[in-house]
Amino acid sequence: PSRARLDNRDAANAPPVDISVNHAVTITVQDSIELFRVAETNDGTYAPLGDISTLNRPLRIGFAPDSISGTRVSPETTAALEDVAQLCRDLGHEVIDFKVPLDGKEFTDKFLLYWAAGAAEFAQQASAYSGKPIGPDIVEPWTLGLAAMFQARQSEMEDTIAYLKAFEAVYDDWFSDMDVLLTPVTGSPAVPIGEQAPDGDFDAVMESVLNFAAFTAPMNVAGAASMSVPLSWSSGGLPIGSMFSAKRGEDGLLFELAMQLEMTRPWIARTPPVSAL
């Protein structure tokens, strides 16, 4: 959901740039809509979501299958996104190729430093709670590595925060000639359990994380409306999400599109080989 669209009782303690997301993963679009309505804020920042019906007009959708930072995207993910783009065309939407106008390496570098600051704060809290110095006895290698990254570049934090705060306006400019942006959610289908375990080799985990989580960060930083829709399936029988994003506040538009997509390609009867449903 758009930043501050849903009730956040801890808003007074929010960090300088709130990159967290307050919502849930639901089985149906209607479930997501109902939860959204219950949790909406009523402070006047946004109009109430109101009634949502299936989209009945064509949209201009930007198609951006490549990672902004140049990390690899699996062929299976790319093929799934191309199929979803064609689905959108079949529904009457105009799909245009879109090159994200962003220095992806700079953005990723700033985002990682900001993320590392959170790990450093957690490590300090763990040390204070345990009475032990920060080290492998109290935190895992992943947290230690991120904390060390922050300590080495702490002097850059002021500029990093300013850059990330300014990004919201940069993001909104992307939509001057389109309604919605279509990208992968992740760089590959779900990775094996343990590949990104925090007790693994730091460099190996970082490489896996950067390749996998290569698309969501801009939307988190911008506080944008964004959704993952499970329209595709991997060769291993796992869902592959497609991410549709819009300007902040355009949550209703995304819900309308989601309802149209769900009616056209329903997923409720499909489950992975191992499922709790």
What residue spans do the PLM features occupy?
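Short glycine-rich, flexible loops that bind phosphorylated cofactors or substrates
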Residues: 70, 189-190
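Short hydrophobic alpha-helices that are characteristic scaffold elements of the AMP-binding
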Residues: 219-221
